[in-house]
Amino acid sequence: MSKANRSLSCIALALTACFLGVTPAVQAQAPGQDAAQAPAPGDKPPQKRPRRTDRIFARDLEGIWISAAYLDALRATRAPLEASKKAAPLVIKVQKEGPSYPLVRTDFDRAVLLRIIDIQPEDKPGAFRVVLAADDMNPVSASETTNISFRGQKNEQGRFERLAVADPTFGKRKFQDVIRLEEGLAPTVNGIVIAGSYADDKGATYSFSRSGEAEVPGGRFRYDLRLSPKGANCSIIEEAQDEAAGPRPRYGFRWKGQALELYEVDAKKPDNLRCGAKPVAVLTPKAG
């Protein structure tokens, strides 16, 4: 599936000398050299060209980025469905794949996959646009590309931690802040929403880890939190199993104060999941 990113590679190679600040070595005057060629008294020695620090490469964007507003809403509600009503989700993933840098964007309902073919500076300081196309191996016309504008400043370590992006598909080209996730999407969301140990009113224990492991009175299983803003009337825990193995067991949940309520899910219509009217268990976080 990997293809050579010819456009980006050619630009990177052409600019290598400038980026590294390479300058010819200055040789000392040899005995008998023409005096006219010798440095005059008081002349300053040649200065090396300063190293460029403002150039942006695809590798600078590598990682998973999430809407800062959505992340704040997730922390406030601890419920993916409610969070998506307060702030539209947006996640961007850039990951090197052979010589290519695919860039995936999603709002958890739809996803768009394109490949980075160029990164170009814009007029304002810290502003640049990423040029994307479905094909990064062959020449493409302007009509076959998508431009996404970004703004951001690298930190002292030369790394982006936060960017503003004007997404044309999921953001109506309005700038919004996105934050780099250090531990990945699922562990971040699990940690905010549900990770922890709980007990019900009968003393039975439940636990959900950041890494996606669940332990309930009925056994252990891998879980995912449903992040799609459509097709359900409550936030849902789904057992992480192949759809080919049959319908995925699901458990609805809502936070009521500090209590985590679990619900049965009616999945007769997979595109319209419904949580029961009353909780089947009410969990209280365990101390420590």
Describe the role of every protein-language-model region.
Residues S2-A12:
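Bacterial N-terminal signal peptides that target proteins for export
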Residues C10-G21:
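Bacterial N-terminal signal peptides
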Residues L20-Q37:
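Signal peptide processing junction and immediate N-terminal pro/mature segment
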Residues P45-P89, T169-T205:
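Tryptophan-anchored aromatic micro-motifs
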Residues L61, I92-Y101, E122-A127, A134-D136, ...:
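Short, solvent-exposed coil/turn segments at beta-strand boundaries
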Residues A76-F128, D200-R248:
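N-terminal glycine/threonine-rich, aromatic-flanked beta-hairpin/loop signature
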Residues Q153, E161-G171, L262-G276:
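Short, exposed beta-strand-loop hairpins at the edges of beta-sheets
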Residues K230-G288:
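Hydrophilic extracytoplasmic domains
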